[in-house]
A protein has these predicted regions:
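Terminal (and in a subset, N-terminal) low-complexity or junction segments at the ends
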Residues: 1-338
C-alpha cells in the first residue's frame, strides 16, 4: 500500500491519520523508511510502536541497519532481542542478518545461522545457501564456504560468484580460476560480479595476460559491459606485474569514469618498481579525486625520497599542511636524506 506511494510524505501523512494502526500498517511504514535509506526514521517509528512488533518488523529494521557502515552490531543486537521476545526467525531474517555478520566478521553467528537453518529445514533455500557461501568466504572460512557450496542442489550465479570471490580474496587465486572454469562447464552465465572475482584472482596471482583475456571475454563471450571496478582490477593486474605503462594506457582509454582505485593501484606499483614519471601523474590525479586522503601524499613523498628527490618529498608534506590534510595515525613519512 505505502510502498506504491511516489513520496514518503504522503504515506506518512496517511499513516498519521489512521486512528488504530495494526502491525501490518506499522510494518508498511517502517519498511518504506528502510527501503528509502531512512533507517533512523524507521528506528524512531519502531521505538514508539504501541503494539508488539512481529518478525516482519524486526526483519525490516535488521536489514536496514545491516546496510549502514556502523549498523552491523546494532543489527545483531536487535536480532538477539527478537529471539528474547520469543519470535521465530525466518529465511528473510537470516538473509537480513548475514550482511551484518560479514560487516563485523561474526563467524560464530554465521555458524549459528547455518545450524539454525539446518534444524529448521530451511538450509536448502538457494538464496540462503549463497549468502552463507559469501559470508563464510568473506570471513576467510573457506572450508565451510566450500562445504556449503558443494552441498547445494543447484548452484546459481550468486553462489558461483561468491565462491570464486572467496578464493580470490584469500590467496587461492588459482583455485578461484579453476572454479570459474567449472562454472563455465556447468553452463551458468557469469555476471559482472563473477568477473570481478576472476580479475582479482588474476591480479593476485600475477597473471596479467589472463586478466587481459578474461577482461576481453566479458563482453565478447558473455555480453557483460565493463564497469569502473573491472577496469580498476585490470589496471591492478597489469601494475602488479610491472607493466605500468600498459596499465596507464588502460586508464587513459577507459570509456568510464576513472576512479581512485585505478590510480591508486598504479601509484602503489610505481613505488614498487621505482617509476617516478607515472607516479607523479597518478599522484596528481589522486589529489584531484581525493584531495583529503593523506595516504596518496605520503605514498608519493616516499617515492620521491626513494629516488633521492628529497625536496619534492618535503614539498608534498608542505602541500598537505597547506590543504589542512593530516596524516593518518600510525603512518610515517619515512623520508631519509643521505
Amino acid at each position: 500500500m505505502y510502498g506504491k506511494c511516489v513520496s514518503i510524505l504522503p504515506a506518512r501523512n496517511l499513516f498519521d491519520e489512521i486512528p488504530q494502526r495494526n502491525v501490518v500498517v506499522w510494518n508498511a511504514m517502517i519498511s518504506l523508511y528502510t527501503h528509502s535509506n531512512r533507517v533512523p526514521d524507521a528506528l524512531k517509528l519502531f521505538q514508539v510502536m504501541d503494539i508488539a512488533p512481529n518478525v516482519s518488523t524486526y526483519n525490516s529494521i535488521i536489514a536496514g541497519l545491516a546496510e549502514l557502515d556502523d549498523g552491523s552490531f546494532k543489527a545483531i543486537a536487535l536480532y538477539w532481542k527478537m529471539r528474547e521476545m520469543g519470535l521465530i526467525p525466518n529465511v528473510i531474517t537470516l538473509l537480513a542478518l548475514l550482511p551484518a555478520c560479514i560487516g563485523v566478521a561474526a563467524l560464530n553467528l554465521i555458524k549459528e545461522i547455518q545450524s539454525y537453518a539446518i534444524r529448521n529445514d530451511i538450509d536448502s533455500h538457494p538464496q540462503l545457501s549463497s549468502g552463507l557461501v559469501e559470508a563464510y568466504g568473506r570471513c576467510g572460512c573457506l572450508v565451510n564456504a566450500h562445504t556449503v557450496f558443494w552441498g547445494m542442489k543447484e548452484r546459481d550465479v550468486v553462489a558461483w560468484s561468491s565462491i570464486i570471490s572467496a578464493y580470490a580474496l584469500h590467496g587461492k587465486a588459482r583455485t578461484a580460476l579453476e572454479m570459474f572454469q567449472q562454472m563455465e562447464l556447468a553452463k551458468v552465465q557469469p555476471d559482472g560480479i563473477t568477473f570481478l572475482g576472476v580479475l582479482k584472482a588474476c591480479s593476485h596471482a600475477g597473471l596479467a595476460d589472463k586478466a587481459i583475456d578474461y577482461f576481453a571475454r566479458m563482453r565478447t563471450d558473455y555480453g557483460v559491459e565493463a564497469s569502473s571496478d573491472h577496469y580498476s582490477c585490470l589496471v591492478d593486474a597489469l601494475s602488479r606485474a610491472g607493466r605500468l605503462y600498459e596499465a596507464y594506457q588502460v586508464i587513459r582509454e577507459m570509456p568510464v569514469k576513472v576512479t581512485a582505485k585505478a590510480w591508486g593501484a598504479l601509484l602503489g606499483a610505481c613505488r614498487t618498481y621505482g617509476e617516478l614519471e607515472l607516479a607523479e601523474i597518478a599522484g596528481k590525479a589522486l589529489s584531484e579525486i581525493e584531495p583529503d586522503n593523506p595516504a596518496n601524499y605520503v605514498l608519493l613523498a616516499r617515492i620521491y625520497a626513494s629516488q633521492g628527490r628529497h625536496e619534492e618529498a618535503e614539498r608534498m608534506r608542505s602541500e598537505m599542511k597547506e590543504k589542512g590534510v593530516k596524516a593518518a595515525p600510525g603512518s610515517s613519512w619515512i623520508v631519509y636524506q643521505d
